[in-house]
Amino acid sequence: MKYEHWQIPAAPEDAIKTLMDAGYPYLVSSVLAARGVTTSEQAAEALEREKTLAYSPFLMKDMDKAVARISKALENGEKLAVFGDYDVDGITSTCLLTDYLRSRGADVTMHIPRRIEEGYGLGCDAIRALSESGVTLIVTVDCGITGVDETAYAATLGVDLVITDHHECKEQLPAAVAVVDPHRPDCPYPFKHLAGVGVALKLVLALGEGREDALFARYCTLAAIGTIADVMRMEGENRTIVQCGLESIDRSDFTGLHALLREAGLTSRPISSIQIGFVLAPRINAAGRMGRAELAAELLLTGDPVRAEKLARELCELNRERQSVEQDIFRRAIEQMEDLPESERSALVLSSEDWHQGVVGIVASRLSEKFSCPSFMIHLSGGSGKGSCRSYGGFNLFNALEACSDLLVSFGGHELAAGFTIEERNIPAFRTRMNQYVRAHTGEHPPVSMLDVDVDLQHPSLITLEEVEALSLLEPYGAGNNRPVFCLRGATLESVQGVGQNRHLKLKLQKSRVNFDGIFFSVTADECGVCAGMRVDAAFYLQVNEFRSQRSIQLQLIDLRPSLDPSGRENEALSLCRELISGGTLSPRDAARALPSRDQFVRAWRVLEREVGPDGVSEPMLPLLRHLSSEMVGAETFLRTAMCLQVFAERGLLSIERKDTTLTLRLTADGKKVELDKSPYLSALHGFLS
């Protein structure tokens, strides 16, 4: 079980009926009603698909100054540079603005810092190199808001800066020609949650005043990819950008984007925000993480189909390399975490010289999810460390870093994700203070890992392929409009098996005579504490699986636990069986409840002789124990049967092998009479009870 608690709301039946009567499908109605939508008018508003952005870009502070300075550079033939970031938001921002400026005939170059050599944001070395190449105006995208010193240095070289960013601002802003950031305290722009690429799009729309519709149509797909990848709130203008971007992806003029979609296997339509976030974006991101962001930028801007195919293959290969490096760092980070005292586990602060700087951020995300706390991963080099951190439970990282700023060289980012630089000697003090800060702001006990379920599916027969396909009406998903979570309670786990080198689980569930196929990524059966035959509660996303042109319903599992319904007594007994057969011990209470009598040993042996035989039997544990317990009564007979098996094995009558959820039994008796009373295990049990 991944989550300590599931929040399952009561079904608002009246609202569901109202929405279904208005023509909305059952699943869509159930999700909307669970989220407070109770009338057809509210539903229409929630599902409305806007085609234009709501606010003028000139509502942003300094947008007029940015447009004036860039327009002057275009008129005078100045050399410009677009200075971006190496994540997907930064890469798409860089490509969007560069493509537009080139369409205006600008002499423009791109600069995306190499993550390892240069690090995040503006750098004086890069500014000097750009100046020496003749650049007189640098426009930043998705970075620059904390570049006070770098902006001042650029001024000494005669280089102007226009800063566009969407990160949190510090008290002092850079003294640039223009600083465009909706998070500026004095910025009146109504929507504060644009991605960096959203701000870049607004700049282009302002520069191309009078051609807004055509420019939005050209660039909304790039803007959608960056917005999804940066996990921005999926509401307001972000929702419009992503909806329009996904709808127009087939019509996009960007040759490289189509090549990457094909190479990533995204050939079916329509493309969803989930596919962008979990399939396409990681491949673009891999270029930046592995220090090759320029490859992704070249791919998105190339018009050469042959070059695009080659670059797309390279990005997919970089992503596979990133996955391998990530898994190794994750394993070693857990090993390091296990050496920390309990007082240093409210916030995980881990460091190593061996960790790839480009991958520590994604590992921090996995650690936060696994251990339910903020995580800080630091790559060390030459006495200094570059860190990436991820939040948990809404904890504000930016404020936490600000509280520890005297220990840091620099920091920046958002509430939920941030980066920082720290001297290696300060890491122990930083670890201590950050743990104290987290406890002070969350209490001594970390927040309980909570799974918010939208819909408890009471009527499995209503879950049809058409119903699942209709869930696309709720797209695009993201923060503020999460992908809906469903659950089935008291379902039977018909089968479970490892796939993908046993890194994932493939399973079959059944409830009310309706069968479902499911996949559970990055989890083993032992980690779930379940086996075939158990009654379980399953939480999942509903999706359509397409294989060899056949479409079917698939459950993408989020969590799986032994059923908490009244029949859970059976699961409790089975859990004890697994413990016993794995060589564990029982409490005196459990032993007393299930200690077999002599007659029960005899009956159990007869069942084994009849059902197992010399060739053995290998089956999922629960069905096998049910079968062998056929002459006994009550759920506790699972445990009693397991105790019989254990004693028989100890006395050389039986061999037992357990692998994951499968039990293999073979009779090994040679016909000699065996005294069960001499079993050390049985003697120990009698000792417990005497």
Regions found by a protein language model. Name each.
Residues Y86-G90, C143, H166-H167, P182, ...:
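Generic detector of well-ordered alpha-helical packing
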Residues G134, V141-L194:
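Histidine/acidic-residue-rich, glycine-tolerant segments that coordinate divalent metal ions
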Residues L97, R102, R239-P282, A286-I334, ...:
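Acidic, two-metal ion nucleic-acid-processing modules in DNA metabolism proteins
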Residues L96, P174-I228, Q600, A604:
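Short alpha-helices
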Residues K2, P9-T136, L157-G158, E209-A429, ...:
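Hydrophobic helix-and-loop "lid/oligomerization" segment in the mid-to-C-terminal part
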Residues H166-H167, H356, H414, H504:
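Histidine-centered active-site/metal-ligand motif
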Residues I127, T151-A152, L645:
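Short amphipathic alpha-helical segments and helix-helix/interface helices
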